[in-house]
Amino acid sequence: AFVCDLMGKEKHNWVDQLCLVAIAEGFNAAMTRTVKYTVGEIRPDGGPHSFPSGHTANAFLGAHVAWKEFKDSCPVLAYSGYALATFVACSRLYNNRHWVADVIAGAGFGILSVELAYLTYFPIRNAIARKINMKGNDRLVVAPTFSPDGGGLYLSWKF
């Protein structure tokens, strides 16, 4: 999605998108891992932790972000993510790593994670901007950072 932003067709700027994806990934990891280790479903190939499919959840998370960002400006791009995510889900079934219910639940968790991120991010971002008496949100930039040694937050404030 970030590469497509260069064409200027996105709904939100890249900083907002980065924050939305990071929040959605956090929701997704928390939900899928909690369920995966609580349920303990055995995989079709005998391995542990089948339900839900984390690969499918991540694939549909990406597809749903693309849909939310590009559905109004570039529908082909918006819907193509779902085709790729469906391919990932089918590959998990084909490779005998998941049951059908696993990939359906994974798709649901991925989409739900994005919806939760979009519901929570903007009110929080706007409240922070109002709290520090800013008229717009372009003076404050907060973005997650990742490295092999850990993660953190990047904070930039124009004054």
Q: What is each model feature region?
A:
Residues A1-V3, D138:
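Generic low-polarity alpha-helical segments
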Residues V3-E10:
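Structural signal for the C-terminal ends of transmembrane alpha-helices
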Residues V21-A22:
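Acidic/His-rich structured neighborhood in mature extracellular/periplasmic domains
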